Amino acid sequence: MRDRLYTTEALIIRRSDVGEADRILTIYTPHHGKLSVTARGVRKMTSKLAGHLELFIHTRLQLAKGRSFDVVTESRVVQPFRSLREDLSRISQGYYVAELLDQMTPDESDNPALFRLTCETLAALDVLDDVVRRDVILRYYELHTLILSGYRPHLFDCANCERELSPDADRYSPITGGVLCQQCSSNEPRTLPINLNTFKLLRYLARMPLETVVSLVPAPATVQEARLVLKASLSQILERELKSTQFLNLVRG
């Protein structure tokens, strides 16, 4: 239960204009989860909130309880992540992270670890110039969003029989939920190929903190294959492809 007037950190992950000057914001918070709130008059040039409630911003909000939506009364930017709104490649990645977070989380279900992961991911995307390194960060975010949402892919034991995987495991099953041993993969026709380098990359991403991963520059083909298997897992769970994927692919070329 939230107080009538409360303060929270928040990430702005979606927004829509309503009326002449208001906006409905979808925010993700560490202790209240995902909320829809209203920012009254924010589109007016004279609004004190203008510029403090942009997409992808990490902010600290003061909110008042309302009938339909809680109301933003104050906002103080914690991290602006300006590059995520100024560079087309980063814009597409910011939209992707925001939509993935939005679709993978129910309303008002707190997950502080997922909030921290998203802040760290946006911070890395904001400063990294190397395209491959930013792609690795997206793979890290996809994998750990799955993990923190209760869908940890099997990368160390077979997704079917749960025996320890050997380096010759080369099939990934989004339906079963991870890598299959050779014996089990022969009985599952709907699998994706996963080579040894991709297998090692996903294991590394699962084990290491993001601050270590930011310096990693694998072969682009390895990152691409990791993208395909993680995309398949996400599509299996969400039962659709994220809308921002098309924008991301278009910008990537």
UniProtKB/Swiss-Prot annotation:
Superkingdom: Bacteria
Name any Gene Ontology BP term: double-strand break repair
Give the UniProt entry's GO cellular component terms: bacterial nucleoid
> What InterPro entries does its record include?
ARFGAP/RecO, DNA_rep/recomb_RecO_N, NA-bd_OB-fold, RecO, RecO_C
Cysteine pairs forming cystine bridges in this chain are none
Instruction: Give the record's keywords alphabetically.
Output: DNA damage, DNA recombination, DNA repair
Known function: Involved in DNA repair and RecF pathway recombination.
Q: Family, per the entry?
A: Belongs to the RecO family.
- The identity of this protein, by name, is DNA repair protein RecO
Species for this entry: Herpetosiphon aurantiacus (strain ATCC 23779 / DSM 785 / 114-95)
Gene transcribed to yield this protein = recO
